[in-house]
A protein has these predicted regions:
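Serine-hydrolase catalytic machinery in alpha/beta-hydrolase-like enzymes
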Residues: 1-82
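Hydrophobic residues on the short alpha-helix immediately C-terminal to a glycine-rich phosphate/catalytic loop
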Residues: 6, 98-99
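Short, glycine/serine-rich, charged loops/turns that create anion-binding
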Residues: 28, 90, 116
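Short loop/turn motifs at secondary-structure junctions
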Residues: 79, 105-106
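Short beta-strand immediately N-terminal to the catalytic nucleophile in serine-hydrolase-like folds
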Residues: 84-87, 110-112
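Gly/Ala-rich beta-loop-alpha elbow adjacent to hydrolase catalytic centers
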Residues: 86-91, 95
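Hydrolases whose catalytic domains are alpha/beta-hydrolase-1, hotdog thioesterase
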Residues: 94-98, 120
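The feature captures the conserved acid-bearing segment of alpha/beta-hydrolase catalytic domains
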Residues: 108-124
Length: 124
């Protein structure tokens, strides 16, 4: 919802009429790093350093959700090469993971202030 507000503030959605924007909001869940407080999160976070445990199941579920959104657009006649995904923080991490695991060729991925989750599962 916060990114939609930014796009609306700068009239991006209105001036780019040939572009369809989809702004999914992460589900509400407890985030361990924030003392279990419930908030929007694509997956649980346990720590900020590279050695912190990762919520593999949550990351894979969120990545699948994004890939399902991509597939919906392809099913609606949009070539995957015209689909770009992106996100900020956990959303960026989800977008990166989805982009690297999708079977589709994408136009690109925009990942801001983020990291690659499950990085050890990818080739160097």
């Amino acid at each position: 919802e916060s990114w939609l507000e930014v796009f609306d503030m700068y009239n991006i959605s209105k001036t780019a009429r040939h572009v369809k924007f989809i702004f999914p909001t992460a589900p509400i869940r407890p985030i361990t790093l924030n003392y279990g407080m419930t908030m929007t999160g694509w997956f649980d976070a346990f720590g900020l350093d590279r050695s912190a445990k990762e919520d593999e199941q949550g990351i894979l579920e969120s990545s699948k959700y994004v890939n399902d959104l991509i597939q919906d657009e392809v099913n609606n006649g949009i070539p995957s090469q015209r689909v770009m995904i992106g996100g900020f923080s956990q959303g960026g991490a989800t977008a990166l993971h989805a982009a690297l695991t999708t079977t589709h060729s994408l136009a690109g991925v925009l990942a801001l202030s983020t990291w690659l989750p499950l990085s050890s599962t990818f080739p160097k």
